[in-house]
């Protein structure tokens, strides 16, 4: 848990449980997880994210939230594996600079956007929207400036390539 002190940059982090792997997390809890947050580099050629989180995802219950700040299209694999679970994307406006081997500085916008990864999911858009709004409200109570996006792909593209089109053109498939 990260708690922000209003009006300051002071953070308080409380860690309730530390586990060595996902299976240990699954066995350490007697009830299903409401959210699974993936903050990893998506390397689908190296490993399958769906395989890794399978033991902590409860069908029709767990919301899978993927930090897609620097990626595109990684949610599809999760939606195919967990068709009855809402998969949301999270895009952060913050920049991260490594100052030393274990020292990092956050700068830039603190805005966070969440929204359904794919609107053509098997899950109704109203349910995806409700989950997005519930998560945004939860994060807002912790003083995180979180907004619900109706088009999360827009935030992903803006974050990855910037707001202008002066850079070279590229083609992507998702």
Predicted regions and their residues:
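Rossmann-like NAD(P)(H) cofactor-binding subdomain of soluble oxidoreductases
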Residues: 11-105
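Internal alpha-helical scaffold of NAD(P)-dependent oxidoreductase catalytic cores
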Residues: 84, 101-174
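Flavin (primarily FAD) cofactor-binding/catalytic cores of flavoenzymes
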Residues: 2-5, 22, 51-57, 79, ...
């Amino acid at each position: 848990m990260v708690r922000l002190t209003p009006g300051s940059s002071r953070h308080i982090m409380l860690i309730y449980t530390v586990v060595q792997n996902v299976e240990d997390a699954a066995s350490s809890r007697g009830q299903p997880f409401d959210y699974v947050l993936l903050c990893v580099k998506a390397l689908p050629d190296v490993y399958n994210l769906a395989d890794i989180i399978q033991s902590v995802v409860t069908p029709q219950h767990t919301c899978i939230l993927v930090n897609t700040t620097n990626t595109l299209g990684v949610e599809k694999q999760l939606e195919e594996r967990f068709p009855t679970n809402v998969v949301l994307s999270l895009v952060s406006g913050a920049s991260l600079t490594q100052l030393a081997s274990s020292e990092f500085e956050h700068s830039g916008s603190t805005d966070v956007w969440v929204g359904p990864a794919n609107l053509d999911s098997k899950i109704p858009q109203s349910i995806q929207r409700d989950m997005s709004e519930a998560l945004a409200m939860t994060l807002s109570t912790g003083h995180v400036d979180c907004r619900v996006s109706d088009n999360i792909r827009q935030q992903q593209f803006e974050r990855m390539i910037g707001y202008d089109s002066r850079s070279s053109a590229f083609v992507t498939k998702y």
